[in-house]
Structures are given as C-alpha cells and as structure tokens.
Amino acid sequence: MLVNENVLDLIGNTPLVDVSNLSPNPRVRLLAKLENQNPFGSVKDRIAKSMIERAEKNGKLLPGQRIMEPSSGNTGIALAAIAQIKGYPITILMPDNVSIERRQMLAVFGAEIIVTPGAEGSNGAVKRAEAMALQNPDWCFLHQYENESNPIAHYETTGPEIWRDCPEVTHFVAGLGTTGTLMGVGKYLKEKNKDVKIIAVEPPIGERVEGLRNLDDGYIPPVFEKWHGRNILDRKRVVRPRESIECTRRLVRECGIFAGISSGASLAGALKVASEVDVAENGQAVIVFIVCDGGWKYLSTGAYTDDLDVAEAAAEKIIYF
C-alpha cells in the first residue's frame, strides 16, 4: 500500500468521471474532472500549494512569516490549511456576506478573518488587502489574481492530468474567476493539440454566480493579461444563476456528484457547448469540465433543497468569488 508523506501529497491527480448521461448530443461525451476530491475540497488546493511552495523557494516567504490573502472561500481555506501544516500564521480578508460554512472552515484551520463590506464584493477585499500589504511589508501577500504560480499550477498538473487520462479531449470548459485554471490548462492543452477548444463560463454582467466573474464587470485579473488570455480562450458562454443551480442539482440527482454551484455553472456551459458542437458523421466530441468543489460549503444557501426561486434569490445575495 502506498503511504504518502503528508496530506499535501494528495493534492492533484483527481479523477475524470463520465457523465455523458447528461449530454444533449449522443455524439458528445461529457467528462467531469472531480476537483472536490482534493484534500481541502477544491481546485484551489492546487494553487495554494503552488503559491506557498514557490514563495518559500524564492525567499518571499520565510519561516514564521504571516501570509495574507483576500478570498471569499476556496483559496483561503486551502491556504489556511497548508499554512497551519507548515506553521505560518495567516490572515484572510473576505466579504461579510459569504456563506457561513466558509468562515467556519477558515476558523477550523486557524486563520485570522478580517471581514470587508459585502456590498464591495471580492474586489473590495482585494483593495483592502493591497492597502494592508503596504502597511505591513513584512507580511507575505500572495495575491492569487496576479501570482503566476496560479496558472503554473494548472499548466504543470491539471492540464497534464487531463491529457494523460483523455488525450482525445476536444473541448475544455471551466469558470472564469482568477482565470488561472483556464490559462494554465488551456495553454497546456493547446500545446498538445492546437485544435482543442477552450471555453470560459461567466455570469451575466452585474449578476452573481458562485465562484465566477464577468470580465466586462470592470476587473480583469492580471493573470489573464500576463498569459495572453485572449489568445487562449476560443469563446465564452454566459450562464445565469438559475441555470447554475439547476445543473448543480442535476449533478447530484443524476450522477451522485455533490458539487458546489460553480460546478453547476461549468456543467451548464458544457451543455451549451455540447448542443452547439458540429460533430462529423461517425465522429465524437469529448468535453472535459471542472467540478470545482464540493457542495458542503453551500448547504446553508438552500441551493440543493429549497424551492428554485428561493434558492436563486438566496444565492444572488451571497458573495462567493
């Protein structure tokens, strides 16, 4: 039996699961990449490990130094868990209207939590963190939105895993947040096969879908610009909050995958692509989409059991990305 040195060795190498029973096109195969199987519960485990370990190697993060990061959830949880294992104190800035489970998980992992006004969204938390970084130059501000260790983590792990397990992939679908997943995986897959299509899922301008942002809402992550995102993305698909919740419920009901709401958005985007793709006779398209995290952090939102109208209204009041 393989014995791992510690839990950090379990980050990555997540499974692909065939969910083609959801496909609207019999010639389009749907595969879900289960990032909820990472030890701290989300795709952000990858970038948290990458950012901390690279900061250690380049001398930006020293023993006992405080880490600071704005995050409304998954990145903060993963950073807090790894920081606790490695002995770093950590401060997480987050909007005051995130789901209660996220605050609870940060507390479990020993993070200091500073809340920012929910009306300012995640952008407000980022601005506050930038100001605090200037006031506390001895802290290590990792800044996932501009840290190249974010897309590098996906270029070095997520992309190669997908290619290893499914070299016949024709489309890759993921949500737009920091854009790290799309940049890293997209660059890797296109280097392997220039014809692979990279599709971003985003909410409508001014609307919230857990884990996602619209690039036209006024903030373009520096990671997207540094990695020439417009050359990597082939198209974007808009997914509304209601569609995200409906598809999140389908994942549970029809596939037994208990996932977060942004995973439902990824599925909704994949279904749109599956409906549009032109598959040659006797051919097949293979769409891989990201299941970003598990559903346990969203139970208090009622996304899985409440009336759909009620769940949609509740989700729109909560900041997730």
Q: Locations of the language-model features?
A:
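PLP-dependent amino-acid enzyme catalytic core
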Residues: 1-321
